[in-house]
Amino acid sequence: MKLTIIETGLVPEPIRADFADYPEMFRNLISAADPDIEYETVSVIQGEPLPDIAGLEAILITGSPAGVYDDYDWIAPLMQFIRDAASASVPQVGICFGHQVMAEALGGKVIKSPKGWGIGRHSYDVKACPDWMGGDCPATISVPVSHQDQVVELPPGASV
């Protein structure tokens, strides 16, 4: 399988010596589980054009300091790319900003939280355990969070 990673943000300067970029972090993480996956990286944040949907096998969209409501020239084409990929049934995963831009592109609503930044560790209740999660899910999970934007309306047909 070939995974196309769409880079939408740059790693903050203080940690670039240890973590060069988000695509590298994801390649390292995913390759530990499946070393046979091939990767292609497209950096929209650095002006690289989005690929043609035809032939793509799977897409991962990284995090970014941008918000879906920001007026950057790469956000609208990325949203169209997401819609085109969804229409072509190409599997997509969004991390942080990636899931927010996917939600907005597919008909959901994302806002800047009126409470400001959410930073720290947060616990979430697991409401469903789909087959692809292995069928053995915990009742709750705790994960580190750092965000100020949130999806407040899911796209049609989406579930959490």
Language-model regions, residue ranges each:
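N-terminal beta1-alpha1 cap of cysteine-dependent amidohydrolase-like domains
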Residues: 1-73, 77-80, 84-88
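Active-site phosphate/pyrophosphate- and oxyanion-stabilizing loops and adjacent acidic/basic residues
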Residues: 24-28, 100, 149
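Residue-level detector of flexible, active-site-proximal loop/helix-junction positions
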Residues: 10, 46-48, 99, 117, ...
